[in-house]
Regions:
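Conserved ABC ATPase "signature" region
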Residues: 71, 118-136
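Conserved ABC ATPase signature
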Residues: 141-145, 149
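A short, proline-enriched helix->beta-strand linker immediately N-terminal to the Walker B motif
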Residues: 160-164
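Catalytic Walker B motif of ABC-type/P-loop ATPase nucleotide-binding domains
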Residues: 166-169
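Helix N-cap at the start of a conserved alpha-helix in ABC-type nucleotide-binding domains
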Residues: 177-179
Length: 248
């Protein structure tokens, strides 16, 4: 943790169940602003649910969640919308509208959520497309984009409102190693240049090693390790050591 760096996200005793299935059980952790946290764990251990709790798509059954000093578990309506404006979300799927061009997909949130004139929207779209390496592709339809291009487009969309916190759900899923590494580099560049806090759910241990300042390891809905990659490698928990040592 960087001294003096306030936490961007805090989970305090958070639990979440779906019926009789306990997905998260009394989970507590935080990530300092401007750092990268990678969340590792087997399938079904609550990783993606954690992201949905951060963006308030789900509510915890117990515990508190703070986003940039806002206790989101106490917010509703306009308060939730205000917090969500601080967060970008890179889904596993790029979440693009198939009937719109790439430009139209990226311009849409600015048109709906801001009062920016078209000229300024054009400038922002062009700038972000340049940042993700799609500067010449804005007239393309989503069906014309390769898997790597769709992932870049999804990242561009997540960045359109200049989020302070960027959530990424399996950013390397379905990509070859070279393309996955390129996506990781884009995320790291964003972190370095804009001091964006990254929270990345991944099964890709190599990606976690590239990205993470700290790693959170979940197993059966509980935190079994939380620390640097080196600390996880030397954890007393055998499952945590295995998860950081090989792809799962």
């Amino acid at each position: 943790m960087t001294p003096g760096n306030p936490p961007a996200v805090v989970f305090d005793g958070v639990s979440k169940s779906f019926g009789a299935k306990h997905v998260l059980n009394n989970v507590s952790w935080n990530v300092p602003a401007g750092e990268a946290l990678c969340i590792l764990g087997r399938s079904g251990t609550g990783k993606s649910v954690t992201l949905k709790l951060i963006i308030a798509l789900l509510k915890p059954d117990q515990g508190k969640i703070w986003i940039d000093r806002d206790e989101v578990t106490q917010l509703s309506g306009p308060g939730i919308s205000r917090v969500r404006r601080k967060i970008g979300y890179l889904f596993q799927d790029a979440a693009l509208f198939d009937s719109l061009t790439l430009y139209e997909n990226l311009a849409l949130p600015l048109e709906r959520l801001t009062q920016k004139p078209k000229k300024e929207i054009d400038f922002v779209v062009d700038r972000v497309l340049g940042q993700v390496g799609l500067a010449t592709d804005k007239a393309k339809m989503p069906s014309e984009l390769s898997g790597g291009m769709r992932k870049r487009a999804g990242l561009a969309r997540a960045l359109m409102l200049e989020p302070k916190i960027l959530l990424a759900d399996e950013p390397s899923s379905g990509l070859d190693r070279i393309t996955a590494s390129e996506i990781d580099e884009l995320l790291l560049r964003r972190k370095a240049e804009q001091k964006t806090t990254l929270i990345v759910v991944t099964h890709d241990v190599n990606g976690a090693r590239r990205l993470a300042d700290r790693v959170l390891v979940l197993d059966r809905g509980e935190t079994i390790a939380h620390g640097t990659v080196s600390e996880i490698e030397h954890s007393e928990n055998e499952t945590a050591r295995k998860l950081i040592g090989s792809n799962v």
